[in-house]
Amino acid sequence: MKTYLQLLEHILQQGVEKSDRTGTGTLSVFGYQMRFDLTKGFPLVTTKKLHTRSIVHELLWFLRGDTNISYLKENGVTIWDEWADNNGDLGPVYGKQWRSWPTADGHTIDQLSDVVQQIKSNPDSRRLIVSAWNVGELDKMALMPCHALFQFYVANNKLSCQLYQRSADVFLGVPFNIASYSLLTHMVAQQCNLDVAEFIWTGGDCHLYLNHLEQAQIQLTREPLPLPSLTIKRKPASLFDYAYEDFEFVNYQSHPAIKAPIAV
């Protein structure tokens, strides 16, 4: 995962100081891309320990179309707690847009089901896109989508995915996002009887919060360890029938966790 460390270093060296919505302040660069060959290991950051339970359960929660944190809480995941209201609701965030995008005529579109069917029936399509950036509902969301849009691409019977992340909390959020969308790519590939190829991460405003700079510098002193591999233990009936127990990150080694405050 030297690719990720290079982004940390780039921001520390080239970033400009900017104000932000949270009032914390950031070092920021605009426009950056990282590519991960999914055939050479699963891209879990190894220079600090990641909570893989949170990564998997959050993705399963998205895939359920859920926007209430009760499922996450039941499974020991707290990463959305800061934004939920007293009832645990977040408004029409990722899961709603992925699975039930509202149309003007009162219907809804299940973007994920549609894109899986498109991959199976027309893998050369240039329209294999899922978007969470619903302009008409942004003001109802507890947090507007940071990872806003992703696109699949099939070549030589292999599936790739590219994510556009308009706002990237590089120390806390991006390692989760890389792992989450890489996992999704593996799952979609399995459902479509394809092999995996690449996950490509493209960031817009890529930033380190000013209270994360020391942690980023600590991480840069650490040597990356070999990447784990991913085992999916069964092929369920659909993309929406996976369970936490279906996934195993084999030989995940990491340096110790590095604590950092979340910017709300």
Swiss-Prot record:
Taxonomy, superkingdom: Bacteria
Record keywords: Cytoplasm, Methyltransferase, Nucleotide biosynthesis, Transferase
InterPro entries, A to Z: Thymidate_synth/dCMP_Mease, Thymidate_synth/dCMP_Mease_dom, Thymidate_synth/dCMP_Mease_sf, Thymidylate_synthase, Thymidylate_synthase_AS
GO BP field: dTMP biosynthetic process; dTTP biosynthetic process; methylation
Catalysed reaction equations from the record: dUMP + (6R)-5,10-methylene-5,6,7,8-tetrahydrofolate = 7,8-dihydrofolate + dTMP
Pathway as given in its UniProt record: Pyrimidine metabolism; dTTP biosynthesis
Compartments where found: Cytoplasm
Positions contributing to (6R)-5,10-methylene-5,6,7,8-tetrahydrofolate binding: 51, 169, 263
Keyword Magnesium attributed: no
Pfam families: Thymidylat_synt
A single Gene Ontology CC term: cytosol
Residue numbers annotated as active site: 146 (nucleophile)
Entry's EC annotation: 2.1.1.45
PROSITE patterns with a match to the protein in the record: THYMIDYLATE_SYNTHASE
SUPFAM superfamilies: Thymidylate synthase/dCMP hydroxymethylase
Alphabetized CDD domains for the sequence: TS_Pyrimidine_HMase
Listed PANTHER family: THYMIDYLATE SYNTHASE, THYMIDYLATE SYNTHASE 1
NCBIfam families: PRK01827.1-3, PRK01827.1-5, thym_sym
Role: Catalyzes the reductive methylation of 2'-deoxyuridine-5'-monophosphate (dUMP) to 2'-deoxythymidine-5'-monophosphate (dTMP) while utilizing 5,10-methylenetetrahydrofolate (mTHF) as the methyl donor and reductant in the reaction, yielding dihydrofolate (DHF) as a by-product. This enzymatic reaction provides an intracellular de novo source of dTMP, an essential precursor for DNA biosynthesis.
SUBUNIT field: Homodimer.
Similarity section: Belongs to the thymidylate synthase family. Bacterial-type ThyA subfamily.
Full protein name: Thymidylate synthase
Chain's gene name: thyA
